[in-house]
């Protein structure tokens, strides 16, 4: 309903795709569904749910199935950060975090894969992060490791299902101007990031969607972050 996810929705609608949107904020979903539908002349439906609820992926699938929606493109984008140090964060919060960023991605992909296999056509995007290539951080202890796992999971989908016309793209943006940092309580840190390292959600979405339709397994948007990731891969973590 905001940030990269909203811009991906706009990009797909501009390509003529009908959309099923999901997020927690029903009021936002109502307004943006109307805006996108009127602007791009496509059908937009939505279901409000919280992916920290283990039942949400099945609820999303049932919603689409009951309405006979055929999902050709699956965007796994939900995410947030945890500001508190790992040792101070309640385990319940860590479990919710893992469900939103990890388990729900696996569940949604697993649930929608069979119909893609049947049609021998499907595009999947998993919104990961440049943090997946970075050394461990003193804060956000789980964020980078989960994103690294998501990259590997995306690779696994490609290895197992490319021959059936299904591809998965891990989109790995760097700092992006969205509500993410405010919602995660780390806006102060974002404000200190140099402007040349910050990019618009619209640009990130465009590069990601282009890469997804091109069947690329991974997309690191902008030359700035391509160079950074090359350096992260080239040098040992001990000297970074």
Residue spans of the language-model regions?
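C-terminal helical subdomain
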Residues: 170, 191-228
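Canonical Rossmann dinucleotide-binding motif of NAD(H)/NADP(H)-dependent dehydrogenases/reductases
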Residues: 1-19
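Substrate-binding pocket helix/loop in short-chain dehydrogenase/reductase
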Residues: 85-87, 93-98
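Residue(s) in the substrate-gating loop at a strand-loop-helix junction
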Residues: 129
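Conserved glycine-rich Rossmann-like NAD(P)H-binding loop of the short-chain dehydrogenase/reductase
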Residues: 15-31
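Active-site helix of classical SDR
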Residues: 109, 146
């Amino acid at each position: 309903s905001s940030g990269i996810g909203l811009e991906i929705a706009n990009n797909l609608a501009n390509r003529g795709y009908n959309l099923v949107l999901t997020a927690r904020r029903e009021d936002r979903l109502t307004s943006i569904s109307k805006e996108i539908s009127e602007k791009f002349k496509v059908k937009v439906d939505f279901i409000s749910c919280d992916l920290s609820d283990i039942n949400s992926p099945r609820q999303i699938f049932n919603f689409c199935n009951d309405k006979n929606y055929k999902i050709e493109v699956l965007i796994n984008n939900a995410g947030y950060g945890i500001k508190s140090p790992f040792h101070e964060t309640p385990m319940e919060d860590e479990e919710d975090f893992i469900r939103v960023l990890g388990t729900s991605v696996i569940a949604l992909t697993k649930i929608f894969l069979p119909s893609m296999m049947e049609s021998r056509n499907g595009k999947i995007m998993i919104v990961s992060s440049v943090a997946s290539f970075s050394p461990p951080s003193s804060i956000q202890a789980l964020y980078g490791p989960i994103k690294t796992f998501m990259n590997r999971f995306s690779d696994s989908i490609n290895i197992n299902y490319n021959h059936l016309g299904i591809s998965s793209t891990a989109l790995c943006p760097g700092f992006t101007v969205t509500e993410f940092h405010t919602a995660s309580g780390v806006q102060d840190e974002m404000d200190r990031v140099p402007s040349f390292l910050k990019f618009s959600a619209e640009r990130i979405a465009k590069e990601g969607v282009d890469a997804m339709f091109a069947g690329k397994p991974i997309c690191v948007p902008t030359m700035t972050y391509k160079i950074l990731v090359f350096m992260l891969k080239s040098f040992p973590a001990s000297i970074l």
